[in-house]
Amino acid sequence: MLIELADFFDCSVDALLGYALRANDRESVGERLKMLRRTEKIDEGVAEAEKALKKYPNTFSVVYESAMTFDFAGMKRKDKAMLRRALDLLSHAGRLLPQNTDPAISELSIKLCMADILLEMEEFDRALAALKANNACGFLDGQIGHLLAGIRERREESVSYLSMALLRGLTTLIRVGCGFANVYEARGDTRSALDILQWLLTVLAGLKKPGRIGELDKISAILIAARAQLFYSSGDMDAAREELARAKALAADYDAAPSHKAANVRFYEGAETVNIYSELGSSAMEAAHQTFMGDEGTERQETFWQGVARPA
């Protein structure tokens, strides 16, 4: 087939193979630019990017990775000219986005990268406007709040953003911690599962307002019940009983005066109307029970639950 094509185009097989190699070359340019950034070969990376842009000025992967190279060089050397070049290239990459095959890169990720470059250039107003324009679902509240808090005359403006970011960050932390606990349990690493749950409990304790009952108490009861279940499964009945008593006491306190108000969370200073909810059970006691029993709870386990004294 190659010989037939060569005859058709009146060229040698070597020339045709060379064309195929050039077509593959643009795909390897991006990987080479990444490697040069990882090894901090800045001059070589910039030179490679300039050469690649002349050959492939409208290839997404080349334009995008060249932008990242100029961004890295500008950040390392505090060179605003390089940062401006990175900004221009990212803008061009946005227009070439239909060529992109990397699911980790999107219109949003490009815009956020541009906002980061504006921050590096100390163009705070433009960076702030870019972040606010792309803050779907409050995804960027933490970045916006952090930026505003760094501007002396705008610090109070940051509070609402920081408050919502605190709640979202806490939610993420709990999910990640519980996810790791499940992984450790499946591996048979009970100690690590217990430790990460205890770490979450320590974080929650630091966010409780003294004298107030709130959703963090319900979540804490669930986490303590999870620790009880781990102790029970590992055969440490005394520790399981102790943790279960703690979980029941906390759950009973919450159920006596349930509150979902975010205002019960320490450091939160956002809107009074914001509420937070846990995902298990209508009551804290029910949620603790579900957590302790799991999906394969036995009658013996239920008897153990019932045998732990419920607070009067």
Predicted features, each with a name:
Residues 1-17:
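Hydrophobic micro-packing sites on short alpha-helices
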Residues 18, 49-61, 92-107, 128-133, ...:
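Flexible helix-coil transition and linker loops at the boundaries of alpha-helical arrays
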Residues 26-61, 65, 69-79, 113, ...:
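Alpha-helical segment of the N-proximal tetratricopeptide repeat
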Residues 31, 65, 69-72, 106, ...:
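"A position-specific structural signal for the A-helix of alpha-solenoid helical repeats
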Residues 35-49, 77-95, 115-125, 148-160, ...:
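Helix-turn-helix repeat elements of alpha-solenoid scaffolds
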Residues 61, 109, 139, 175, ...:
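Residue register of alpha-helical TPR repeats
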Residues 67, 72-78, 101, 149-153, ...:
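Short coil/turn linking the two alpha-helices of tandem helical-hairpin repeats
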Residues 190-312:
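Eukaryotic alpha-helical solenoid repeat scaffolds
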